[in-house]
């Protein structure tokens, strides 16, 4: 094989082309590739950190939710206890008031019964006296009734004094 000028020219132009590519084209391409690799690595690292932070935040959030549930449960239990205490107090107060009202009404009833009895007794005494007076007027001459009437009047007057 003969080395002629064409092969030498092609070899020289190929060497110049390779040198030109190595000098001016490859460095920006390599730089862009390296920059993109760094960006991808940084993104992956930040993604891992974000996932770890997310896990930590979720744990904290779950803990806060659990604490809140416990506090809410405690508050509800305390409110229920206070409610039952207030209801018991109200029941006891209402029972005491009902007893007082019952006693007051019972006293009023007893007082009215006594007044009615007095009035009834007074009316009976008045009617007895009136009947006795009529009998006396009708039978004043009869001695037989005099003793009975005097006895009745004396007993009625004694009863009247007792009232």
From Swiss-Prot:
UniProt superkingdom: Bacteria
Main location as per UniProt: membrane
Segments crossing the lipid bilayer: 13-33
GO MF entry, a single one: proton-transporting ATPase activity, rotational mechanism
Keywords from the UniProt entry: ATP synthesis, Cell membrane, CF(0), Hydrogen ion transport, Ion transport, Membrane, Transmembrane, Transmembrane helix, Transport
Membrane topology summary: Single-pass membrane protein
Short name of one Pfam family: ATP-synt_B
Keyword ATP-binding among UniProt keywords: no
Compartment(s) of residence: Cell membrane
Annotated protein name in UniProt: ATP synthase subunit b
The gene coding this protein: atpF
């Amino acid at each position: 094989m003969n080395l002629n000028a064409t092969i030498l020219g092609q070899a020289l132009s190929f060497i110049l082309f390779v040198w030109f590519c190595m000098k001016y084209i490859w460095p920006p391409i390599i730089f862009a590739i390296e920059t993109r690799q760094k960006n991808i690595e940084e993104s992956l690292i930040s993604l891992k950190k974000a996932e770890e932070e997310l896990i930590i935040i979720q744990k904290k959030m779950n803990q806060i939710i659990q604490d809140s549930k416990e506090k809410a449960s405690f508050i509800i239990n305390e409110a229920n206890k206070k409610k039952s205490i207030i209801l018991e107090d109200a029941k006891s107060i209402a029972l005491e008031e009902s007893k007082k009202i019952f006693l007051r009404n019972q006293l009023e009833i007893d007082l009215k019964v006594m007044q009615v009895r007095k009035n009834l007794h007074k009316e009976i005494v008045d009617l007895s006296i009136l009947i006795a007076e009529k009998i006396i007027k009708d039978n004043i001459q009869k001695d037989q009734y005099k003793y009975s009437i005097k006895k009745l009047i004396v007993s009625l007057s004694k009863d009247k004094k007792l009232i």
